[in-house]
Amino acid sequence: VYCSEDKTVQGLGGKDEVTGQMSPKNMLTTTICDELRLNSNFKSKVIGIAIKDRGSILPAGHSANAAYWYDGKSGNFITSTYYMNTLPNWVNDFNNRKVTDSLYKLNWNTSLDKSVYLNYATADIKDYESKPFGKEQLGFPYDLTRYVGKDFSKISSTPYGNTLTAEMAKAALIAEQLGKGNATDFLAISFSSPDYIGHAFGPNSWEMVDDYVKVQNLALQKKKQETIAKWSK
């Protein structure tokens, strides 16, 4: 049994209703988000966001207003009928932006001088790496443009998966007006790409180091003041 599998619900936003049959039904305890909702008499708003379904669903708890996760088949953030009957307009608008394709066009190269990676990681190319971008792409730089409009799943194994998650979180923050009511809201964000990258390349890889370098420069942090200005209107 998969931790967040739920065949009693239907997926929303993916290629079909089977994709996205997920919920917190199998979780046998409450979370901090559940306790927050209970304490506020369900006035607090709770939303979970992640690339992985379990990274979005489980932290947000049983009583979340929504949980959204990434569907690598469609390139959309999706949810299930456990939370709602239709996707909100703002989620459809976000999906229509095709953020994944925009990020693919940036390709993936190192952010710092190669000497930095030599200090913190092993050699750039190791036999045990799973080569998620094909056997012909061994080590930096990685050409991601080949996946534009074709394979939306590869984003998860790059630092741009973090950027995609952050952009979705920003959209939720603004559209749902989180933090503007009298009750405390909770936006549960999980960054899944470090796990994908670690499994694909190893914890001491150049890719892992570069992922954490890029995490520090996320658009969510760079545009903090811009986000707050939009949100506070």
Regions found by a protein language model. Name each.
Residues P203-Q216:
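Active-site-proximal segments of metal-dependent phosphoesterases and phosphodiesterases across multiple
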Residues A183-D185, F201-N204:
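Composition- and surface-driven signal marking solvent-exposed, interaction-prone regions
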Residues V1-N182, S192-D195, H199:
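His/Asp/Glu-rich, glycine-adjacent segments
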Residues F186-S190:
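Structural motif
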Residues A171, A175, M208, L220-K223:
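A cross-kingdom marker for long, charged
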Residues K214-K233:
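Metal-dependent active-site segment of extracytoplasmic phospho-/sulfohydrolases and closely related
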